[in-house]
């Protein structure tokens, strides 16, 4: 874990209306977002392979999000 930088996650929380964000809150959200992104990516890879491709395309990501 730890691939996502905390600063952009902090900005997302502030964009949602928070005036202040604890470092722990930003870290927890970053961990969740990273886990979610990995799960979506795994599904997208499966869709690409099923289509006979090695390259994951935007359509694979979109399908993975919907599934």
Curated annotation (Swiss-Prot):
Top-level division of the source organism's lineage: Archaea
Region listing for Interaction with DNA, in residue ranges: 20-22, 54-57
Subcellular locations according to the entry: Cytoplasm; Chromosome
SUPFAM superfamilies registered for this protein in UniProt: Histone-fold
Keywords annotated in UniProt: Chromosome, Cytoplasm, DNA-binding
Xref: Pfam families: CBFD_NFYB_HMF
One GO cellular component, as annotated: chromosome
Gene Ontology MF: a single term: protein heterodimerization activity
Chief location: cytoplasm
Function: Binds and compact DNA (95 to 150 base pairs) to form nucleosome-like structures that contain positive DNA supercoils. Increases the resistance of DNA to thermal denaturation (in vitro).
Family, similarity comment: Belongs to the archaeal histone HMF family.
NCBIfam families named among the record's database cross-references: archaea_histone (NF043032)
Quaternary structure and interacting proteins, as annotated: Homodimer or heterodimer with another histone. Dimers then assemble into higher oligomers, with the DNA wrapped around the protein core.
Protein name: Archaeal histone A
Native source organism of the sequence: Pyrococcus sp. (strain GB-3a)
């Amino acid at each position: 874990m730890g691939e996502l930088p905390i600063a952009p996650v902090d900005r997302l929380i502030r964009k949602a209306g928070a005036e202040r964000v604890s470092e722990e809150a930003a870290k927890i959200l970053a961990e969740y977002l990273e886990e979610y992104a990995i799960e979506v990516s795994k599904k997208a890879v499966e869709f690409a392979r099923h289509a006979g491709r090695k390259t994951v395309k935007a359509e694979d990501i979109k399908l993975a999000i919907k599934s």
